[in-house]
Structures are given as structure tokens and as C-alpha cells.
Amino acid sequence: MICPHQGTCGGCALALPYEEQWKLKESEFRELLPLSKDTPTDLYPSAPHSFRARAEFRLYRNESGRLSYAMSQKGSKQPLPIQSCPILLPSIQALMPSLLEALESDEILTQKLFGVEFLSGLSQEVLVSLLYHKRLDHAWEERALGLLSSLPTLSSLIGRSKGQKIVLGESFITETLTIDSKPWRFLHYEGSFTQPNPKVNEKMIEWIISAPPQGDLLELYCGAGNFTLPLSSRYAKILATEVSKTSIHAAKQNCELNSVRHISFVRLNAQETQSALEGEREFYRLRELDLPSYDFQAVFVDPPRAGLGAEVASFLRRFDQILYISCNPKTLQSDLEVLQLSHDVERFALFDQFPYTPHLESGVILRQRR
């Protein structure tokens, strides 16, 4: 990747040629989890540029008043003015200069504007959020509508200030992911978590659904259904739980968007789900579900960086098959210490969702020992 700011921009921590950093990540993973050296491991590197679907920039004016995007300098909070960012999807890269030019010529839109956020996808829709240290009034909204209409590739525009959000267009983009040649549509909401690297995300989903299905599926940490929807093509019944109200709302919308009827999304955290399935607590949110009718033999988890923790990991040992996507190899290592008391690892996978950073996504398929 050719970037004039590589090595000085704080956004990319690994200033190495892509092939070198990918080999480094694989090596570090295998050292941390020696079992992976003797276990089938599938490798999914990223494209070296034009891969990232989200971006957050500060706004910076130099001494002559010229406006530019900015990142923090490496190892510092000092702003580093930039005009482009080659890791971003082409849809974002193409919009950045024209958006900046339009903003620079409008005093109302730039007054107390401190940040710009981009959200896009393979569908090429682009949603932009403008972040302010001021109350947004009718004059701002009129100028923002003019900005939106003047930029054909800008799908929606959101203005944000403390306690205030003005949506011009939609508060989401509609993304299409192609999984094993089948298109799946998703609403990706501004401000909510979405996978940052859509092409690698497609590979992650394909890898997970390639595992032979068993019985019915329980999913914890389901988010907006990124994995759940494609998994529905493999399982007769799925119960998917998630603590975020916004994500559950989006997941149900995504079900409707794809005409899927055999997933039940419920707002519960992992510990609450465990309590419900073990009969320790009854939840009003589960009142319409016939839990005893489920034949849970498989469980899928995609936990946050903190991992599962010993309690949830112990609970998963009751399932014959465990499908695990991890965004933190260190917590995966500690979770596997618990899971391997009863299960064998059948396969690993490494996914580079975050090139030019130390972060690495991985997958594990485990099966209960007989």
C-alpha cells in the first residue's frame, strides 16, 4: 500500500509491507496457541488497500485557514492533516475530497465542526455524520440539505451535537453480502457496531456456515445478525441473544429484509441466557418461546475482546459443537483452556479484519469428546 502518511499516522500501527505483517500475525497466533501448529488452519488475508468500511476523522484548519481531515500523529495527540486514506473503501475515498471542498466553502456547516465519520459497504452507499460543539438549528439543516443534494454519492447525512441528532435521509446504509453465491441484505446503523472489512467478513461467514450443522443452534452476542442470518440457511431453528436493544431491533429488521422466519432474537446477555436455559430464572422476554422444544446441539459465539470468561465458557461445554469467532487471541487462549476440558479443537481459521494494526480475528470449531 502506498500512503504518504504511513509511519507517521496513528491510525495504522503496523508500518510494514502487508505480506510481512500477515506472516507476523500468523506467527504470533501460533506461538500463543501452539495447538494451532498441529491443527488444520484456514488463512484469510485481506486486500492490502481499499478494504475498510468505516472511518472517523478530526477536522483541522491550518494557519492559512485551509480545512483538512486529520488523524492523531503516531505516539501523540497532535493532529496530522491528511487528504486521503488508501485503506478505505473506494466509495469513501471518492467522496472525501468533494465533501471537504463543499464544507470548506460553507461557514454555517463548518462552525464548531470537529469531526466527520463515514460508513459505507460493498453496496457503495455512504452515510456521513458531522460532529459539532454547537446546537444545530434550522439554518444548519437548510445548508446540510443543500450539501446532501449537491453530492450524488452521499446517501445520507447526520448532524450530531450533545443531546441532538438530525437525520437527513436514513440513519443506516443497506449492505449486501454475498455468501456462497447467495446475497444477504443488512441494515448497518450509524453508531452501531458493524464488521469493518466487508470482504473478509464474507469469508468469516462462509467459514462458519461450512461447519456441518447439528440440531438447533443457540447464538450468544448475536449483534444485528451478521452471522445469524446466513446460519439460518443451515439450521431449522435458531435462538439468538444480544444485550444491545439497538442491535436486536436491527436484527429483527434484517430478518424481515431477507424473509427469514425461523430465528428468534431476544434481548438477553450471555449470563441471562445461561440462567434461562438452566431453568434458574424465568424472563418475560422469553414468554412466547417454547424453550423445551429446541434441540440445542450447537452454539455459536462472537464475544467482545474480553472473551467469554470462565462461567460462560463452562456453560458452553454442554453443547456438542462450539463455533467460536474471536477478536482477541489472548482471551481465546484462556477460554480454550476451559473448553478443552471436554471438547477437541477440529479446526482454526485466521482472518485479517484489521490490516496495519496488531489486531487479528480468528475462528475455532470444537466438538465434544465421546
UniProtKB/Swiss-Prot annotation:
Keyword Methyltransferase belongs to the record: yes
InterPro entries documented for this protein: MeTrfase_TrmA_AS (IPR030390), MeTrfase_TrmA_CS (IPR030391), SAM-dependent_MTases_sf (IPR029063), TrmA_MeTrfase (IPR011869), U5_MeTrfase_fam (IPR010280)
Enzyme class per UniProt: transferase
Coiled coil: none
Sorted UniProt keywords: Methyltransferase, S-adenosyl-L-methionine, Transferase, tRNA processing
Active site positions: 327, 361
GO molecular function annotations of the record: rRNA binding; tRNA (uracil(54)-C5)-methyltransferase activity, S-adenosyl methionine-dependent; tRNA binding
Any one Pfam family match given in the protein's UniProt record, by short name: tRNA_U5-meth_tr
Catalyzed reactions: uridine(54) in tRNA + S-adenosyl-L-methionine = 5-methyluridine(54) in tRNA + S-adenosyl-L-homocysteine + H(+); uridine(341) in tmRNA + S-adenosyl-L-methionine = 5-methyluridine(341) in tmRNA + S-adenosyl-L-homocysteine + H(+)
Residues binding S-adenosyl-L-methionine: 195, 221, 226, 242, 302
GO biological process, one term: RNA modification
Family label: Belongs to the class I-like SAM-binding methyltransferase superfamily. RNA M5U methyltransferase family. TrmA subfamily.
Name recorded for this polypeptide: tRNA/tmRNA (uracil-C(5))-methyltransferase
Gene: trmA
